[in-house]
């Protein structure tokens, strides 16, 4: 596995669509992704990454498998794009889930 930037760094460099480039490094913009799929998906827009997340058949008729990461599969089925608001929302969800886990395990008061 590698760390995938769902909203790619290259897109930010070219379009400057995030109000703050530091948001690229938030947990909400990252996911684990199989190395081969991450290489294929690289710097594409989210809408173009969907085929790599879900799997596809190339021009030679070879089937290229998709990811086994359930969250990316759900996102690729339900979202058309992944933008700044998605990064922020997902970041808050991840942090809140982690804090809740720590509390459930009595690791945080």
Give the label of every model feature segment.
Residues 1-109:
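Flexible coil/loop and intrinsically disordered segments
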């Amino acid at each position: 596995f590698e760390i995938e930037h769902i909203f790619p760094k290259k897109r930010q460099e070219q379009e400057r669509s995030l109000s703050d480039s530091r948001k690229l490094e938030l947990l909400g913009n990252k996911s684990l992704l199989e190395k081969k799929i991450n290489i294929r998906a690289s710097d594409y827009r989210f809408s173009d990454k969907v085929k790599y997340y879900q799997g596809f058949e190339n021009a030679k008729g070879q089937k290229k498998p998709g990811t086994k990461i359930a969250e990316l599969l759900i996102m690729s089925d339900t979202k058309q794009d992944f933008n700044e608001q998605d990064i922020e929302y997902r970041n808050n969800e991840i942090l809140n889930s982690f804090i809740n886990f720590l509390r459930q395990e009595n690791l945080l008061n």
